[in-house]
Every structure is written in C-alpha cells, then in structure tokens.
A protein has these predicted regions:
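Hydrophobic anchor residue at the start of the ABC signature
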Residues: 146
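ABC ATPase NBD coupling module
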Residues: 65-79, 103, 109
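Conserved signature/switch motifs of ABC ATPase nucleotide-binding domains
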Residues: 134, 152
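Conserved ABC ATPase "signature" region
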Residues: 102, 109-127
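Short coil-to-helix segment of the ABC ATPase nucleotide-binding domain corresponding to the Q-loop/switch region
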Residues: 90-98
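The conserved cystathionine-beta-synthase
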Residues: 257-285, 308-367, 373-383
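The feature captures the beta-strand-to-loop junction immediately N-terminal to the Walker
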Residues: 34-36
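Helix-to-loop junction immediately C-terminal to a conserved catalytic motif
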Residues: 49
Length: 383
C-alpha cells in the first residue's frame, strides 16, 4: 500500500505543485494518476521513491514513512519505469535487466537467470538478450524497461507514462502485456498518464488531478464514467463517457442471430444464393475473416474481396464490444466469436440497445423494491 497523507510540494515561493494530497494506492492494484499538464502527477509519483522530497505531509509504503527509510534500500525495493525506458546503452539487454539484482548482491548467474525469465515474461524473444538497446525498437526497449523494473521482484512499481513514446499499435500491445503481467504478479502499482483512455483501461482506481495538484476525484473507472463529481472531471473524462462506460458492463446472454456464411473460393452463384447484400466469410477454422459485398463478386471469393473493417466481439465480452462490432460492421451485423475465435452468430446495434434498456429497467425495479422494503411496505401497501 502506498499512502499520501496531506502531501504538499512547493518550489521556492511559487504556488504548490501538489497541494494537500491525501490518497491511498491499494496493495496489489493499479492506481492511476491522470490530469492536465501542471497537475502534479509526475511530482506525486517521484515523491514515493524520494526523487523529490515533499515540502510537508508524509508518504508511506505499507505503513512506513519513506522519509525514515534508507534511500538506497527504498529505491532498490521499488520498480521504476519511465517514458523512454532509460536503459544503459553500453549494456546488453540481459545485463540491463539484471542490474538491480546484481546491486542487491545476487550472483551473476542467478541475476542473469532471473533476467532471462523476465525477458520471456514481457514477451521478448530470448535471442534479443545479447543485443544492445540501440538495436531494439521503441516497443522492445519499453518491454526491457518493464523487465528491469520487475527483476528483483519489488512489491511496488512506479510507472511514469511508460507507453506514451511508442506508436498506437505498439502501445496497445504493451498495455495488454502489462495487464497480463499484473494479473500474474499483482504488484502495487502507481501509474502516471495524461491519457484518460489509458487510465480507464489500466486502472483499478483512477485519481483525476486538477492543475495545482488538487485531487478532484479518486474512484474506480466505471464510477468516473457514470458519476463524475463535477464539471471538471466530466469534461476531462470526455463527452462520450456513457459509451465508454459500456466497456465495464458485462454482456447479458443476448440471443445471437443466425448468419449464413461462405468460405474462400465460393463462386458468385454461391454468394448470391445466400440472399444478403453482405455475406460473411470464414476461414478453415471457422474464424471470421471479413465481409463480402455480394454485388462486387465477379469471381471466386479471394481475400482481395474481403472488407475487414468490422471488429469481432467475444460472446463473454462487454456491451461496448458488442455495440462496436455492430457499428463497425459494413453489413450492420456485428460478428461474435467464441473464446477460441470461432464464429457463433451476429448481433445488431438495436439488440444491444434493447439489452441496455432491459438492464436499466431491471435496476430501477430492484431499487424501487429495495426502497419499499426499507420502509417496511409490501407491494400492495406501497405508495
């Protein structure tokens, strides 16, 4: 657990960079600090490992005031990942990852063995271990940075915009890898980002900071989206928060629609015989590979005729995933697959909206029933 108690940081006679901050980052969870430039999120992070000293207040880890701890031991017990990885350019990947274990007195063999475990854990090929940072892509360097931070198995991780310097595709991959690793290791993580979408995706709880280091709201992502505390948080979270909140709503057992499908190589007559403007193509494993527009088929179906714009939702996914699949599909029919990626049916946007309405009606009915019970009334005597 990382706890801030009335923490303030000022520089000279200027206004506070962080102002009377009190919050608690729970053990084993990802707590995200997010806010506009100048809100003090990085300053807050750096006060945990005492790269910056608070002007007043206390920062504690598992109940121990960090100001009372030996500085070297404090920092060696905290994993730290920064924006541009910060790797040592003169050391190979394996030696970069082994840095902290070696500082802690591990033998070279033990430290390197641990480093190789982590290189694989973060999704890197073992043969990259002998390369130098300059020989890696930006995404690979960030993975090495995460591996190095985890090398000594620290209970606490600090991550300062670790994925912001890579392209969107790599960023998505790194985020997914990070969530996988966190699910496996359960570190107490304080994560800084300026991107509210990243905060909502990664955080168990999200702290929204105002300029000047004031805490506006600290809540679960779904709470931020459904119930922002004021106009500042509502504006910062975004006008489409209702749609994004659907990512946290588990999809009910929607009845899926049957859909006629074709395989690659289907003839124009076979495609037209389906009787739809758009026909879904599956591969040999029954996985969806794209839609074919019937009017455009003038030869046996090949991959050049496929429209791949639509996303594929999982049957056990969220309402947002189902709605996105329907809205992004060129046919208007969202593709749904089982956990193994095999096609099982389609869903319309109207199906999802109806499911949302049913969920809300059921919630209102439940709340009304609870209110009636609280006053000791049965349904017949309720006002």
């Amino acid at each position: 657990m990382i706890r801030f108690d009335g923490v303030t940081k000022t520089y000279g006679g200027g206004p506070p960079a962080v102002d009377h901050l009190t919050l608690e980052a729970a053990t084993g969870q990802i707590s995200v600090l997010v806010g506009p430039s100048g809100c003090g999120k990085t300053t807050t992070l750096r006060m945990v490992n005492r790269l910056i000293a608070p002007t007043s207040g206390t920062v504690s880890i598992d109940g121990v005031d960090t100001a009372t701890m030996d500085l070297t031991q404090l920092r060696r017990g905290i994993g730290y990942v920064i924006q541009h990885a910060g790797l040592f350019p003169h050391r190979t990947v394996v030696d970069n990852v082994a840095t902290v274990p070696r500082l802690l007195g591990w033998t070279k063999a033990r430290a390197r063995s641990r480093a190789m475990e982590l290189i694989e854990l973060v999704g890197l090929e073992p043969d990259l271990a002998k390369r130098y940072p300059a020989q890696l892509s930006g995404g690979q360097q960030q993975r090495v940075g995460v591996a190095r931070a985890l090398a000594a198995d620290p209970p606490v991780m600090l991550m300062d915009e670790p994925f912001s310097a890579v392209d969107p595709v790599v960023r998505e991959q790194l985020q997914q890898e990070f969530l996988r690793i966190q699910a496996e290791l359960g570190k107490t993580t304080l994560f800084v980002t300026h991107d509210i979408d990243e905060a909502i995706k990664l955080g168990d709880r999200v702290a929204v900071l105002r300029v000047g280091g004031h805490l506006a709201q600290f809540d679960a992502p779904e709470k931020l989206l459904s119930d922002p505390i004021d106009d500042f948080v509502a504006e910062f979270v975004g006008r489409d928060r209702g749609y994004r909140a659907l990512a946290f709503a588990a999809a009910p057992a929607l009845p899926l629609r049957d859909e006629a499908t074709i395989a690659l190589g289907a003839t124009p007559d076979e495609v037209r015989s389906v009787g739809n403007d758009w026909v879904l193509a599956l591969d040999d494993d029954k996985a969806p590979i794209g839609w074919v527009r019937t009017a455009a088929v003038d030869r046996p179906v090949d991959r050049t005729l496929l429209h791949r714009g639509g996303t594929v939702a999982r049957a056990n996914g969220s309402l947002r995933a189902l709605l996105d699949a329907a809205l992004s599909s060129p046919s208007g029919r969202g593709v749904v697959a089982d956990p193994d990626g095999r096609f099982i049916g389609t869903v319309l946007a109207t199906d999802v909206v109806s499911a949302i309405q049913r969920e809300r009606d059921a919630e209102r009915a439940s709340q009304a029933q609870a209110g009636t019970a609280a006053y000791g009334l049965d349904e017949e005597n309720a006002p």
